[in-house]
Curated annotation (Swiss-Prot):
Record's subunit section: Homodimer.
Record InterPro entries: ArgP, ArgP_gammaproteobact, LTTR, LysR_subst-bd, Tscrpt_reg_HTH_LysR, WH-like_DNA-bd_sf, WH_DNA-bd_sf
Encoding gene, per UniProt annotation: argP
Entry protein name: HTH-type transcriptional regulator ArgP
Alphabetical list of Pfam families matching this protein: HTH_1, LysR_substrate
Keyword DNA-binding: yes
Family: Belongs to the LysR transcriptional regulatory family.
Record SUPFAM superfamilies: Periplasmic binding protein-like II, Winged helix' DNA-binding domain
Domain HTH lysR-type: start-end pairs: 2-58
DNA-binding positions: 19-38
Keywords assigned by UniProt, alphabetized: DNA-binding, Transcription, Transcription regulation
Species this chain originates from: Pseudomonas fluorescens (strain Pf0-1)
Amino acid sequence: MFDYKLLSALAAVVEQAGFERAAQVLGLSQSAISQRIKLLEARVGQPVLVRGTPPSPTEIGRRLLNHVQQVRLLERDLQTLVPALDEEGLPERLRIALNADSLATWWAEAVGDFCAEQHLLLDLIVEDQTVGLKRMRAGEVAGCLCASERPVAGARSVLLGAMRYRALASPAFIKRHFPDGVRAEQLPRTPALVFGPDDFLQHRYLASLGVDGGFEHHLCPSSEGFIRLTEAGLGWGLVPELQVREQLERGVLRELLPDKPIDVPLYWHHWRNGGQLLGLLTEQLVRSSAQWLVPLD
């Protein structure tokens, strides 16, 4: 039998990115957390954590974390059927990885009423849509919104739709860098805005226009900051259409190459044995996402 106090310690260390915060969340001392991790490692006969900054799970650690995630969700189902088992009456929590642009646009409206009705709290982890699945693979989250269709072992994926991005810049930026009109081959020689080192959307966009190679760019790991920097004329950027309709109407931002958007698919990944709550959340996302996402051709 598993000792779930030990597994909870492992989950807390990974989820809270360290022993100190894990101790605070569980109401224990750091030494107690460390002792539980050592005891768990003694029981399984191998390390469950790589002691780094932050600590990361080993292969067996990931398997144990996956197990903990699914047990938490199944326990919630049982408590719904037998309310007497839910002695504390605390709201359920789900850890979910998603991309910053979804969080800044449609996510809140899609899940707001659902979370209120289900008495659900969310722990949201922001990751680029191309790499968020690593959190799922590590057993750190119960669900993941990302651009990859292929699920990890033990999970399912469902296509929700696509976020449409447009290449935009301020009128002053366009006048300064493209006085004779915008041509695709000029883009690599003008400053761009990129969300982070894992963001390759600009590379894909330029490749779709037949333009290869590197390009000058700023790094801005904030969806809101990305818009502000674009408006201020620091560079051109690929921006979610959902996020800038007002700016386009007012002429604060303009499209560099009209009718040449790029669509990024969004897949919802969730554990197969995630219980009723995760199933209901999946149904809610499938049902509501069509209001904001475009169909994928």
